[in-house]
């Protein structure tokens, strides 16, 4: 299975990575083209475009100005250890064994506004450029126009390399929109996680994000070969609901936390 996840706004470049093993992003030429567009922006324009504070806008203006493609381990960090946030809390990369980390390298991909598609051990520099950003560029008025079919082609290439035809979409809608679903050369499965609150099961963002990370970890650890094995997912109290599920959208429920 090939697993797709979103990146995170929260980054950790303070703590050293747990391994020196690393790879380089495949789409750095495209990243550099985007950076050139970002370098044209003033901090005031960045604040407006990204809807962030003046402080964060200033930080990212400096990051854009300093970005260069020949980065090395030390100034850069592997994506799976650099991203922090609810999905990555659930995934808990810091506790992966060497074998599990290699499995993640083969079966996990991180969608990115700046880097397109990342392998877990791909080095990245600190950045903020969400996929939904309406950044004017040579190809159009946003990042979806910029990336076009490029990310989808990389997903299809990774799908072939990892050996089967199942794509598990654990990314947010904002990020998965960068993938052209009709051009995918595999079966797409999008799990849904619902928590019970006040007697009703519904998607609660904080819990759902962590659950996506938990399922990504489950896939890396258990290496399920088919959907029957995938729906055996039962971490953190979630269980499969046959009644609410379809083959392309398995639903997992969790009862109200006491």
Swiss-Prot record:
GO biological process, one term: response to hydroperoxide
Gene Ontology annotations for the cellular component aspect, listed alphabetically: cytosol
NCBIfam families given in the database record: PRK02101.1-1, PRK02101.1-3
HAMAP family: UPF0246
Similarity annotation: Belongs to the UPF0246 family.
Protein name: UPF0246 protein Sden_2729
Naturally occurring in which organism (per UniProt): Shewanella denitrificans (strain OS217 / ATCC BAA-1090 / DSM 15013)
């Amino acid at each position: 299975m090939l697993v797709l996840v979103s990146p995170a706004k929260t980054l950790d470049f303070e703590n050293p990575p747990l391994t020196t093993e690393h790879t380089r992003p495949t789409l750095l030429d495209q990243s550099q083209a985007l950076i050139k567009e970002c370098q044209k922006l003033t901090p005031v324009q960045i604040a407006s475009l990204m809807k962030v504070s003046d402080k964060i806008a200033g930080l990212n203006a400096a990051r854009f100005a300093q970005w260069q493609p020949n980065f090395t381990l030390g100034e850069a960090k592997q994506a799976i250890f650099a991203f922090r946030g609810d999905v990555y809390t659930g995934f808990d990369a810091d506790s992966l064994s060497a074998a599990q980390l290699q499995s993640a390298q083969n079966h996990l991909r991180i969608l990115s506004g700046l880097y397109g598609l990342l392998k877990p051990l791909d080095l990245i520099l600190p950045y903020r450029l969400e996929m939904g950003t309406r950044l004017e560029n040579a190809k159009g008025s946003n990042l979806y126009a910029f990336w076009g079919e490029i990310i989808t082609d990389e997903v299809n290439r990774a799908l072939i390399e990892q050996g089967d035809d199942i794509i598990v979409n654990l990314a947010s809608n904002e990020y998965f929109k960068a993938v052209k679903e009709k051009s995918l050369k595999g079966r797409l499965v999008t799990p849904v996680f619902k928590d019970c609150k006040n007697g009703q099961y519904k998607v609660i963002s904080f819990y759902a994000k962590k659950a996506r990370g938990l399922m990504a970890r489950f896939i890396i650890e258990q290496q399920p070969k088919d959907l029957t094995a995938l729906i055996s997912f039962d971490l953190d109290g979630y269980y499969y609901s046959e009644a609410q599920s379809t083959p392309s959208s398995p639903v997992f429920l969790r009862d109200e936390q006491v």
